[in-house]
Amino acid sequence: MASEHQMPASKQQPASPNIAIFEQENFQGRCHELSGACPNLKDAGVDKVGSILVHSGPWVGYEQASCKGEQFVFEKGEYPRWDSWTNSRRSDSITSLRPIKVVRAPRQPLPTRQTKDSQEHKIVLYENPSFTGKKIEIIDDDVPSFHAHGYQEKVSSVRVQSGTWVGYQYPGYRGYQYLFEKGDYKDSSEFGAQHPQIQSVRRIRDMQWHQRGAYHPSN
């Protein structure tokens, strides 16, 4: 869902991260603004997170202090209540936050044999720890269902070659969220999963705009 008033990509400059946290739903109550990582929101005077407005981002929130526990990814946009940023139903608590660094791979003027691997987003997910077993490789695409692509295995290790991604426990971008920044995750504990289950994945793009959050409750 792109903003209606975007500059051409070639002229856009990445904005400094900025997020507003409201203690009540629908952007009511005391407001606290952050422009950098906060390992404990209570130490910053935030008693409760009821709604969130991301002016520039993206960001990741955590259930526990020191960026631990369940993860919640926030892109630029409005999140009026907790079920607009998650549908895992396990927790509505956010205790720490940090900005996500979105690193773009350099674009090449022409696709050649030498530059064909310079994709902006590339991730490989493996069945077993230490990058073994069956795998699914995703390049410059969002995948709402691994099963639809013929991959029905567990995901125990992940290698992010470029871009920033968020994986989900269930198809359709539902369930627990797992942030994947560039690098290697040798087993599921390294990306914060209690069980090696990921069934959908999408790219994080800092110019994306969510008017009412990433989730749309049926009620």
UniProtKB/Swiss-Prot annotation:
Keyword Acetylation: yes
Residue ranges constituting the Beta/gamma crystallin 'Greek key' domain according to the UniProt record: 17-56, 57-101, 121-162, 163-205
InterPro entries per record: Beta/Gamma-Crystallin, Beta/gamma_crystallin, G_crystallin-like
Renumbered residue ranges of the record's region C-terminal arm: 207-219
Superkingdom of the organism of origin: Eukaryota
PROSITE patterns per record: CRYSTALLIN_BETA_GAMMA (PS50915)
Region (Connecting peptide): 102-120
A biological-process GO annotation: visual perception
Region (N-terminal arm): 2-16
UniProt keyword Metal-binding present: no
UniProt modified residues of type N-acetylalanine: 2
Keywords: Acetylation, Eye lens protein, Repeat
GO molecular function list: structural constituent of eye lens
Family membership noted in the UniProt record: Belongs to the beta/gamma-crystallin family.
Subunit structure: Homo/heterodimer, or complexes of higher-order. The structure of beta-crystallin oligomers seems to be stabilized through interactions between the N-terminal arms.
Domain note: Has a two-domain beta-structure, folded into four very similar Greek key motifs.
Function, as annotated: Crystallins are the dominant structural components of the vertebrate eye lens.
Name of the protein this chain belongs to: Beta-crystallin B2
Native organism: Gallus gallus
